[in-house]
Structure formats: C-alpha cells, structure tokens
Amino acid sequence: MMERFEKIEMKIPAKAEYVAIIRLTMAGVANRMGFAYDDIEDMKIAISEACTNIVQHAYKEDVGEIAIVFGLYEDRLEIMVADNGVSFDFNNLKRKVGPYDISKPVEHLPENGLGLYLINTLMDDIQIMHDEGMTVLMTKYIQREQVENDGNPISTYESY
C-alpha cells in the first residue's frame, strides 16, 4: 500500500529574485506541519542553496524554470527541486569538497560545491539525479519529541 501524502507544486523563473518566494512557501508549509523553528531555518538554507545552484549554473545565458514539489507526509517533508539545464556529476563534486575541516579558515573552503555540502549537512537525506538537468530530493523528518510533553507539569505558583 502506498504511503499517503499531500503534494504542493510550484514553478518559478530561474532568477535570484524568485528564490525568496520558494523559501517563504517552504517555511509556511513546514510550520503548518509542526516542524521546530531550528529545523525550518535549516530547510530554508537548504532550499535556498538548491535553488541558487540552479540560478547560477543550470541555464547559462538562458532563463529557464525551477520546478519545486513539496511532499507532505505524516512524519516528514520531502522537497524536490529540479531544472532542465546543464547537469554535473554530484559524486565527483562531493569528493572535491570533502568533509569540512574545522581547522581551516572559512576563506580557504572551496567555493564550488559548498552549497551542496550545506544541503547534505542540514537535511536528513539528500538524493541527486542528473540526466537532462538536475533533480535534488531533500528530506527532513519531524522531530516530535522536541514538542511533546515530558510528563512534568510546570506551575506558575510558588510552593511554600
């Protein structure tokens, strides 16, 4: 049996000025689903990076589109960001970027691929498919234990 979910689809021009629309939409969806503030902030960075990569690299001089699909599940949000532009080899780029070395100053981090490194760090799962264009599928699980009651009621009254 297929898992039930709701789907929200959007298309925007692959221009920097439209990335904020996607970021705000995602934040609204995640808030409604019950995500914690920090998780929403992480997802805002991740979706901004995915869209910005498309704006900067996918279409060269042409202006294409970015397709975004939000899959709303009971326990997670899946975000698909896709383009039909120029593709690249994610695994090769990932090897070049490598793990973050805390001893290196920020100025010495490689610029290419840092966005994908951030996405990989901030999301629970990331899958990248590249045939004609690029599709990034990012998943973030709702951490319900952050908002559940721990069984210790808090009182505003002082005990004497």
Swiss-Prot record:
Pfam family, one: HATPase_c_2
Domain of life: Bacteria
Entry keyword set: ATP-binding, Kinase, Nucleotide-binding, Serine/threonine-protein kinase, Transferase
Catalysed conversion reaction: L-seryl-[protein] + ATP = O-phospho-L-seryl-[protein] + ADP + H(+); L-threonyl-[protein] + ATP = O-phospho-L-threonyl-[protein] + ADP + H(+)
EC number: 2.7.11.1
Source species: Bacillus cereus (strain ZK / E33L)
UniProt enzyme class: transferase
Name used for this protein in its record: Serine-protein kinase RsbW
Family of the protein in this entry: Belongs to the anti-sigma-factor family.
Function: Negative regulator of sigma-B activity. Phosphorylates and inactivates its specific antagonist protein, RsbV. Upon phosphorylation of RsbV, RsbW is released and binds to sigma-B, thereby blocking its ability to form an RNA polymerase holoenzyme (E-sigma-B).
InterPro entries the UniProt entry points to: Anti-sigma-factor_SerPK (IPR050267), HATPase_C_sf (IPR036890), RsbW (IPR010193)
NCBIfam families (UniProt xref): PRK04069.1 (NF003144), rsbW_low_gc (TIGR01924)
A GO molecular function held by the record: protein serine kinase activity
Gene coding for it: rsbW
